[in-house]
């Protein structure tokens, strides 16, 4: 089985499409086509073979694409190459590109219809053997109509067409060499199969006969067709009527015939003997052609290349080789080259007039007008759409303005309401601390007792709450109308939260007061105070036992008189009902509620007499003392009890109270102890007080509290001489204040039990010293140094009874120390 014949057709000449169409009917052929057509589908119409439509599988728009394919795959070698060129410079370039795809047996057929003697030029371009280069031409007039469509132009009475294959190796040779003839015979057989209705001729293997046939086809195209373009003549029959055409025709034909003669070619055809016969034969051939010769057709329709180099330059080069002067041919070549540039639109000064140009321009203008009209319609539609959108937006703006105005009005009303609420809240908050919370009327002119009523749930957060409340007042006072609705709502919520917080605190105070009232109502009966564990007894240090029925060293009337005079410093116990404040808080001082304790140390009942001897008279007779009292205030766990003297309670209207009369008597006991110190106000002399040492309590029975001691540099002698020990309730933590000579009084806390509550101690001084204690778990204890409160008077009564016990144990030293003064009144120096 023989391998397929690999054929390459390369070029843009219309005759190559004719050959391609005929190769599609051959078998066992691998066909490749390279041209500038963008479409691989073709249609060819001919007189004998009709219309043929075909598609090329191996189609390439340029020769470089084929070269790239060969570089990728490799091994692509063609057996036959049929090629054409538009200029002499293109021939060597094409041959160099396809040379890698050629071998020694590759045959080249160059399209030479209208051209002469190109084989020597091809051989000189590349190093190829002349035996492999041949020429092919035909009398078919194939013209390109449009892209991919070709048609044969001919007369209707044509009988046959010819295809000629040969070689022009030497002008003077009459026959080919023995190696060329078999190749030509093979070509003849091949093309005879491709063109069965045409004549494939070799001209009896005569190179001179083949060259003479080339001149017969090329002579009219060289001398007459270019003149039609130059003289702008479409009808060949009237060309010789031009005055300028006759000398040009004569000059061109004379030079061409001279070249033929120099080449030794005999023109045996009677139609090509002289100028008249050649012109007549040309007119007869072009008479039946509707569009004139092919060169004029290609110039007018710009269908194909004019091939000016191959058509005119090659005869000039031949004439130069044979020593023939060709001025007409050279002038014609120059003019046709410029016309070719003008036809392509490459001229800088001239432009071709085209009949279709005006129509094309009109069509272009109409198309542009239609496009602009379409754009105008689109713009109008978009304009109407935008207008509708503008109307909608304007309506939305109006509605939004109405909403804004209404919202402004509503916000203004809400702002006024919030301002009123804030003002009412401010007034209620500032008026509430001035309200009467302890049951004592403002007309009592209470100035000497500090009553610290505080909420038990406040703790260390009291200062934080005050700061937050103050910041809230500042923030509410700075409210302006420029705040938006969100800030107004936030402030309204904040005000409501503050109001709820105040209401919760008020309810908590009422609950605490109610619990306190129930606690006072559920107190056990009065018990005898036996003194703390450190009190001297018969079994301790040989001290004399304490006699509770000890006779008073002064008479009852004197005692009553003294207590009457001292009633200015204490509350009244004659009131039968306790005083209840606005928060249902029972004032234990003014109510005169007796002291009660659950401690196991009070093992004895107090005797039937109501009052103990509280103060031992001094040597200054029954002179009433104007010294301030030092009282003891127990903690919340020890309950409150009033101070009574000789059965006659102090009148509440005569009580002197210092400091805060509107505060709650219970302070929240949270946080670490905070010492507050007030300046001493001199009420008649310096304070002289006895040292109160802490009792010797058992640690197992002792609850958490505070241990304070009080000392003074003025009492150094009294400290050495006074050994009286005063005890307090064992249920409360002991508190002893000590005044150091080096530093001001300090309060030191010893927290022993987190669950115990801290007592309150009020010690009479010329001016009050207020001290707050706080722990993390217990409410803060409040220690106030100043004029005794009602609690202090009650605590002082018990303390005076204890001091009387100490006096009974030291009867033997009365005479020696008769100028001394006991109980809580310090020694008064003259």
From Swiss-Prot:
Composition bias type Basic and acidic residues, residue spans: 807-816
Chain intervals with Basic residues compositional bias: 817-830
Coiled coil: 379-400, 481-514
Compositional bias (Low complexity): 513-527, 538-555, 738-753
InterPro entries (UniProt xref): 6PGD_dom2 (IPR013328), KPA_reductase (IPR013752), KPR-Related (IPR051402)
GO cellular component terms listed in the entry, alphabetical order: cellular bud; cellular bud neck; cellular bud tip; cytoplasm
Sequence segments annotated as region (Disordered): 426-488, 513-558, 648-699, 727-757, 796-830
Key words of the record: Coiled coil, Phosphoprotein
Location of Phosphoserine modifications: 659, 732, 767
Keyword Thylakoid found: no
PANTHER family according to UniProt: PROBABLE 2-DEHYDROPANTOATE 2-REDUCTASE, PROTEIN PAM1-RELATED
Other remarks on this protein: Present with 300 molecules/cell in log phase SD medium.
Protein name per Swiss-Prot or TrEMBL: Protein PAM1
Organism of this sequence: Saccharomyces cerevisiae (strain ATCC 204508 / S288c) (Baker's yeast)
Gene name in the database record: PAM1
């Amino acid at each position: 089985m023989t391998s397929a014949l690999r054929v390459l057709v390369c070029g843009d000449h219309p005759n190559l499409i004719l050959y391609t169409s005929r190769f599609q009917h051959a078998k066992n052929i691998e066909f490749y086509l390279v041209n500038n057509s963008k479409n691989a589908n073709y249609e060819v119409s001919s007189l004998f073979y009709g219309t043929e439509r075909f598609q090329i599988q191996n189609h390439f728009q340029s020769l470089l694409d084929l070269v790239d394919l060969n570089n990728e795959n490799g091994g692509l070698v063609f057996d036959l190459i049929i090629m054409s060129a538009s200029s002499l410079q293109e021939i060597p370039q094409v041959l160099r590109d396809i040379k890698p795809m050629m071998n020694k047996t590759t045959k080249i057929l160059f399209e030479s219809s209208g051209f002469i003697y190109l084989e020597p030029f091809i051989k000189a371009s590349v190093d190829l053997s002349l035996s492999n280069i041949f020429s092919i031409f035909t009398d078919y007039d194939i013209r390109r109509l449009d892209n991919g469509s070709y048609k044969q132009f001919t007369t209707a009475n044509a009988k046959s067409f010819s295809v000629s294959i040969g070689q022009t190796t030497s002008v003077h040779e009459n026959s080919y060499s023995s190696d060329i003839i078999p190749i030509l015979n093979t070509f003849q057989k091949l093309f005879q199969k491709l063109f069965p209705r045409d004549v494939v001729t070799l001209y009896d293997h005569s190179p001179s006969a083949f060259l003479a046939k080339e001149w017969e086809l090329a002579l009219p195209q060289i001398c007459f067709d270019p003149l039609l373009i130059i003289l702008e003549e479409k009808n060949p029959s009237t060309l010789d009527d031009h005055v300028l055409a006759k000398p040009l025709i004569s000059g061109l034909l004379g030079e061409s015939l001279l070249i033929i003669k120099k080449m030794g070619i005999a023109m045996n055809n009677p139609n090509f003997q002289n100028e008249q016969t050649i012109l007549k034969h040309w007119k007869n051939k072009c008479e039946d052609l509707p569009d004139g010769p092919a060169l004029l057709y290609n110039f007018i329709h710009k269908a194909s290349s004019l091939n000016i180099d191959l058509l005119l330059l090659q005869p000039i080069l031949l004439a130069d080789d044979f020593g023939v002067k060709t001025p007409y041919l050279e002038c014609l070549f120059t003019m046709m080259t410029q016309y070719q540039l003008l036809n392509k639109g490459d001229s800088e000064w001239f432009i071709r007039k085209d009949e279709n140009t005006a129509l094309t321009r009109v069509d272009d203008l109409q198309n542009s007008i239609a496009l602009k009209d379409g754009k105008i319609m689109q713009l109008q539609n978009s304009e109407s759409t935008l207008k509708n959108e503008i109307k909608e937006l304007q309506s939305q703006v109006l509605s939004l303005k109405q909403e804004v105005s209404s919202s402004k009005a509503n916000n203004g009303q809400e702002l006024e309401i919030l301002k009123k609420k804030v003002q009412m809240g401010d007034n209620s908050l500032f008026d509430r601390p001035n309200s009467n919370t302890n049951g004592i009327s403002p007309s009592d002119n209470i100035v000497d007792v500090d009553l610290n009523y505080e909420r038990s749930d406040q703790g260390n957060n009291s200062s934080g709450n005050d700061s937050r409340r103050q910041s809230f007042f500042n923030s509410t006072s700075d409210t302006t109308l420029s705040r938006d609705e969100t800030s107004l709502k936030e402030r309204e919520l904040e005000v409501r939260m503050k109001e709820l917080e105040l209401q919760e605190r008020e309810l908590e105070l009422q609950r605490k007061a109610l619990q306190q009232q129930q606690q006072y109502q559920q107190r056990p009966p009065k018990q005898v105070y036996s003194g703390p564990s450190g009190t001297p007894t018969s079994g301790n240090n040989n001290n004399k036992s304490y006699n509770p029925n000890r006779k008073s060293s002064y008479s009852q009337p004197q005692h009553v008189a003294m207590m009457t005079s001292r009633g200015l410093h204490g509350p009244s116990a004659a009131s039968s009902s306790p005083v209840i404040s606005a928060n249902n808080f029972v004032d234990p001082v003014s109510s005169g509620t007796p002291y009660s304790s659950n401690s196991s140390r009070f093992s004895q009942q107090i005797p039937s007499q109501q009052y103990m001897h509280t103060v031992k008279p001094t040597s200054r007779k029954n002179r009433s003392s104007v010294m301030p009292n030092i009282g003891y205030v127990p903690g919340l766990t020890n309950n409150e009890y009033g101070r009574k003297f000789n059965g006659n309670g102090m009148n509440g209207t005569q009580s002197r109270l210092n400091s805060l009369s509107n505060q709650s008597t219970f302070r929240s006991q949270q946080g670490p102890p905070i010492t507050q110190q007030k300046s001493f106000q001199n009420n008649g002399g310096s304070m002289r007080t006895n040292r109160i040492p802490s009792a010797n309590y058992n640690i197992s029975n002792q609850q958490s509290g505070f241990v304070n001691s009080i000392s003074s540099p003025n009492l150094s002698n009294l400290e050495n001489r006074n050994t009286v020990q005063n005890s307090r309730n064992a249920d409360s933590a002991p508190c002893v204040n000590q005044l150091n000579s080096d530093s001001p009084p300090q309060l030191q806390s010893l927290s022993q039990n987190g669950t115990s509550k801290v007592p309150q101690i009020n010690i009479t001084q010329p001016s009050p010293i207020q001290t707050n204690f706080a722990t993390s778990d217990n409410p803060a204890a409040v220690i106030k140094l100043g004029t005794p409160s009602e609690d202090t008077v009650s605590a002082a009564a018990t303390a005076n009874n204890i001091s009387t016990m100490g006096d009974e144990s030291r009867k033997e030293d009365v005479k020696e120390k008769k100028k001394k003064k006991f109980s809580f009144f310090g020694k008064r120096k003259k």
